[in-house]
Curated annotation (Swiss-Prot):
GO terms for molecular function: magnesium ion binding; phosphatase activity. It is an enzyme of class 3 (hydrolase). Belongs to the HAD-like hydrolase superfamily. Cof family. GO terms for cellular component: cytosol. The keyword Metal-binding applies. This is Putative phosphatase MPN_381. Pfam families: Hydrolase_3. Its cofactor is Mg(2+). Keywords: Hydrolase, Magnesium, Metal-binding. Phosphate binds at L12, T60, G61, K217, N245. Mg(2+) binds at D11, D13, D242. Its EC number is 3.1.3.-. It comes from the Bacteria.
Amino acid sequence: MKNKIKYVYSDLDGTIVSWNPKNQFTHQGKTYKNLHEVSHATVTAFKQLQAQGIKIGIVTGRDYCRVRWLEKYLNTDLPTITLDGAIIYFRDEIIRQEVLDKEFIHGINQIVKRYPTAAFKLNMGWGNYYTCNPSLIFEGDHAYREHFNADSKFYRKEIDNTVDWDINNMKVNQVYFDTFTCPEPMIQELDNLVEKSDVTAKSYRHSLYIIKKGVSKASALQNLQRDFLVEMKPANTIVFGDGDNDIEMMQWADHSVSLTGSDPECYKLAKYHTDSVDDDGIAKWINKNLLC
């Protein structure tokens, strides 16, 4: 296997970035977890892979404003896959994006008009449109955007959820709700809309996000292989991941690594296994199997 691998795509959170980082950063007087923290062991392992000619890329569910600094810190070689495959960036340009249907966005618009206190955002390429409603999740977005990306194209706008939107001039890649702010009847309406629409929704403890149906980390890798990285194949690519949104790419690649503490199905599907992110699992696996 060692001599077969030419490409590495790694998830971030729970894979090479701990949910419990040692460091914090301060923005406008408030302190936030530094979810850009990658261990020295992992950074060193990636650099050693690159020195051997193996290319490194990031594949994540994060918004690019929470990835761009890390992409540059790790000096990645490959396009960066964000929003679980909905947008792919390379050298500060969008090279591919998947857009939600206008009919679906119209449906979202009609629902949020009935619940004016709900906090949500519309991800649209370099721009994110937020309600003015308080949200700890989106407060973190603003901190990462402004603290780490002062030199970028990112912009933030406010969207009024009490009026009809100009949907014809909107290209929305992802809709993201802070479900702490959404009443139960609203969640039910969103579930009903999702069920009859061409979309995929994922719900976690504090959030609900929606992207176009059929879009995943695996579909993004397949599109890159077809249109941009023709030499990248399942046989010469290894993926690292821990979550349920990593399952499809585990099935796509011939080589895959999951960590202790991962989503059970993801862990089961992975070809190889390693210690947890807090125990430098990925760095240990690379050193033992690719740098030996």
